[in-house]
Design a protein with these regions (language model features):
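Residue-level detector of alpha-helical secondary structure
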Residues: 2, 6-20, 25-50, 56-75, ...
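Short coil/turn linker and secondary-structure boundary residues
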Residues: 26, 101, 126-129
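Alpha-helix capping and inter-helical loop/turn segments
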Residues: 50-51, 100
Length: 146
């Protein structure tokens, strides 16, 4: 399940750099085009299992295990700067993409990942929202000033 999902984090630094409304829109579409199949796989997996909560927990465990394997040092820890970037990436790209599937159990999947993420990673009690809310939070340029 979710083989290779850790690759969604390959361009984390680039996708978070100079994050503006226009670049966020483009980055999100590129992210969905490249990695949307992982999020469809998540929803299909939940559909295929009778215990939906357990299925969502398994998805969360799989994702987090792959993140730890990719980013942890030899001591088994993720450095604090990388963790902050991963947290922001989850908030800006991963959770909105999950919710963007508009699947019946998308919120359950997001809740499970969010909860497990906070338990597993130090100082990572993050929240999530959908794409439209995030997109709306970016300011428009006013007379080219902002």
């Amino acid at each position: 399940m979710l083989n290779g999902i850790e690759t969604i984090f390959d361009n984390t630094t680039q996708m978070l750099r100079h994050l503006k409304k226009k670049s966020f829109e483009k980055n999100t579409q590129d992210f969905i085009d490249s990695y949307g199949h992982y999020f469809r796989e998540m929803t299909e997996y939940v559909d295929s299992i009778s215990d939906k909560e357990r299925a969502a927990e398994e998805i969360a465990d799989t994702l987090i295990n792959r993140v730890e394997k990719k980013f942890a040092s030899k001591k088994g820890k993720i450095d604090s700067r990388t963790q902050v970037d991963l947290n922001f990436f989850m908030i800006y790209y991963v959770f909105p993409t999950i919710l963007g599937t508009e699947h019946e159990y998308a919120k359950l999947i997001a809740d499970s990942i969010c909860s497990a993420w906070g338990e597993r990673f130090k100082e990572s009690q993050i929240q999530y929202t959908d794409y439209d809310t995030l997109y709306g939070s970016f300011r428009e340029k006013i007379f080219g000033i902002f």
